[in-house]
Amino acid sequence: MKYLYQFFLLTTIVVFNLQCTKTDSADAGNFASNGGTGTGGSTARFTIVGNYLYTVDKQNLKVFSLSNLAEPVLKNTVSVGFEIETIYPFKDKLFIGSTSVVYIFSITNPEIPERLSTAISPNVLRRCDPVIARDTVAYATLRTNSECGGGTQSILAVYDIRNIANPVQKTFRNLQEPYGLGFADTCLYVATQTGLNVYSIATEYNPVFLRTIRNQDWFFDVIPYGNTLIAWTKDGVILFDITNKGNPAFITKII
């Protein structure tokens, strides 16, 4: 948990500094009009959507009103399941990863999250589930190790979410100890214990492996932000230039 908060603080600082360097007023306007949703990684335990903060612990989803930032107010606590790991916002939905399934909640009523469905991978029995989504597809990394309850496969799972009430796993890719993930345009970035994997998702349900970026680092999570990829590693935060989305170029490392 200590490393999660360190990443959150460093990411906030980096994103703020990147935003301050933007001189194009249209870019600034687009950022400001992004629904008030905070930037966060796929392994986060909290996210901000509009005027609400959503957090998860091992079993529950909690909703806080941020109408008064000085005094957040707990509005609701919703039982989700067991061994909850991550939370990720997508439009008016929350994707909540656990060691057994991905839960999908509607936040059409932001103070009363409603469970819509669950997504289960037939490939592994127990795992850690960072998850992201866009349009009609969701991607989850399913990591099987002692921390996540054992199992036999670590994979990148691809879900068809066109019917949000009945998500279906379309395909998967075998990986070695995957962690967080993020996407920019038609590229998907997956943090792993052995490097940063880059995939083309031009065909969204069929990720095509492009390359692995190895910097002698154990990658935990990534946040694409414009033409910059913010990567959280075991030894600090690395910034990559992703002007060429399929070929991240090292910029600097923040210890």
Regions found by a protein language model. Give the residues of each.
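Bacterial Sec-dependent N-terminal signal peptides
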Residues: M1-F31
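Feature marking well-ordered beta-strand scaffolds used for ligand recognition
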Residues: C20-I255
